[in-house]
Structure formats: C-alpha cells, structure tokens
Amino acid sequence: MRRAWALVALVAAGLAVLTLLAAAAADLLDGHPAARVVLVLANAGSVWAGQAVLAGWLVRRPWAAALAGPLVGLLSLVTYYVLGALTGLTPWSGLADNLGWLVAAALAGVPLGLVGALARRRDGLGALARLVVPAGVVLEPLARGWLGHGELGGGPRGVAGLVLVVAGLAGGALVVRRRIVTSR
C-alpha cells in the first residue's frame, strides 16, 4: 500500500512539473504553436481528472481511492504553484488566487478516485468505469468548442482538441476490445 501512495505522489508531482514546464516553454518560445498545444493538453481538465482516476486505481480500495482522488489533485496544484513561485514562473499569490481549483480538486476527486477503484473490477461496471476517462477526453474539446470556429486548421486549441479526441477514442477502443476479449 505504501508503494501505491508513493506512486500517487509521483503522479501528482509529475503532472505539476509537466504543466509548469509546458507553461515555461510556451513563454520561452514566445507562444510557439507546438508549445501552446502542449500547454493546452497539460492544462486540460480531463487530464487533471484522469490523474484522480489513476490515483484511485493505484490504491485499489474504495476508502483509499476516495482519499487518493482529491489528494492527487490538491498535491498537483500546490506543487505547481509552489514550484512556479520558487522559479518565478507564477506569482506567490497564484495558490490563493486559484482557491476555486483547490475546491474543485477536493470535491471532484472523491468520485473520480472511486471510479479508479471501480476500474479494477473485471465485470461490466469495471469496464464502464474504465471508459470514464476516455469519454471525458473526447467530450472536453467538444464541450469547450475547441474543434469549432476555425481553430482546427492551426490554432493550438484545435490541434490539442484533435489530439484529445483521437487519444480518447483510442483509449475507449482499447477498453472495449479488452472487454470483448476477456469475456470470451
């Protein structure tokens, strides 16, 4: 169980550092389109929600998953803003200015962590839980309008949206294929 919690902390730190590096690269490269695409992907809500599902999956048990989901989100946010402030990439007030994200991580993390624990099941409910992240990854760019209004042709959000849709469809296909193969 300790190893699982260490992995949860590693996931949190990893996403925080990735997002911070993406922001730094976008600034350093004067908003280069490729750097902006990576930044949009790193900041995608479905990616941050996905880490809560992964945390729940890592710790396995429902009670632990209900703790791991919010913990990974909160730890990622705090790590992002503290490292950002220490490196001068974000202001020290960043954490206080974004209390809404902390509340969202705490509240949404509980059910998302539980989805992760459910995803370990080998029945239909487990398969359904494993489809939550791919579905969210597909739906986010559609719901946020990233694929409309001419952005698809070259705008960073359009490209990131397309990447998310393709990744989500591929992830969903893997879940469905695995479910079909294991049910034989």
Residue ranges, per PLM feature:
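Membrane interfacial helix motifs at helix-loop boundaries and amphipathic/re-entrant anchors
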Residues: 20-47, 78-104, 124, 138-163
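Structural signal for the C-terminal ends of transmembrane alpha-helices
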Residues: 54-63, 119-120, 173-179
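Internal alpha-helical transmembrane segments of multi-pass membrane proteins
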Residues: 61, 65-70, 117-138
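Alpha-helical transmembrane segments in multipass membrane proteins, preferentially the mid-helix core
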Residues: 106-126, 140-146, 170-176
